[in-house]
């Protein structure tokens, strides 16, 4: 039996009046169950000439999470931002060291420790995507451009784990979705 708060129903009635409604779904996260109401809203993009476009160019890196620069169509750089989530990376590397210590003592899989590592990694990618979008909105960018990253066959040597944990495609999908 599912009950809804009055505020939730009021919010849906006020904010989702003119949006296309889909079938509600019941999702489980951990031990909690959530009722999700999906809606679709049509957004129309502005038609801007190529000469008047403002571009947000994003370079996803291993050391800095992202390097963003705002450029005009003639090539002049208007703004620049380095997204480096240092504390989150420190938490991630500390969690990886916990996994390493646990696996040194025996051939254990450590699923809870790996889940913590993966959750930290998705959190880093979400925060990076949010920083990129906020920077693009700040300068009213018309287009967000990512570099083409192909890492197949290049995972060897010292930075192999760092490259394996790099979530470049997830960041691109999150930015595209938002």
Can you say where each PLM-predicted feature lies in the sequence?
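Charged, flexible boundary elements
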Residues: 1-53
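Positively charged, helix-rich recognition surfaces that bind polyanionic ligands
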Residues: 31-178
């Amino acid at each position: 039996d599912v009950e809804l708060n009055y505020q939730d129903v009021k919010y849906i009635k006020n904010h989702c009046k003119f949006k296309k409604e889909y079938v509600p779904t019941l999702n489980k996260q951990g031990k909690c169950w959530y009722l999700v109401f999906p809606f679709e809203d049509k957004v129309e993009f502005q038609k801007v000439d190529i000469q008047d476009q403002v571009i947000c160019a994003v370079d996803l890196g291993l050391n800095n999470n992202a390097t963003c620069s705002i450029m005009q169509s003639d090539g002049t750089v208007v703004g620049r931002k380095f997204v480096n989530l240092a504390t989150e990376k420190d938490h991630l590397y500390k969690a990886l060291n916990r996994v390493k210590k646990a696996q040194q003592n025996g051939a254990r899989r450590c699923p809870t420790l790996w889940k913590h590592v993966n959750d930290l990694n998705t959190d880093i990618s979400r925060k990076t995507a949010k920083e990129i979008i906020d920077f693009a909105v700040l300068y009213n960018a018309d287009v967000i451009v990512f570099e083409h990253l192909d890492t197949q066959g290049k995972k060897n040597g010292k930075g192999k784990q760092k490259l394996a944990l790099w979530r470049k495609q997830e960041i691109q999908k999150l930015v595209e979705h938002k």
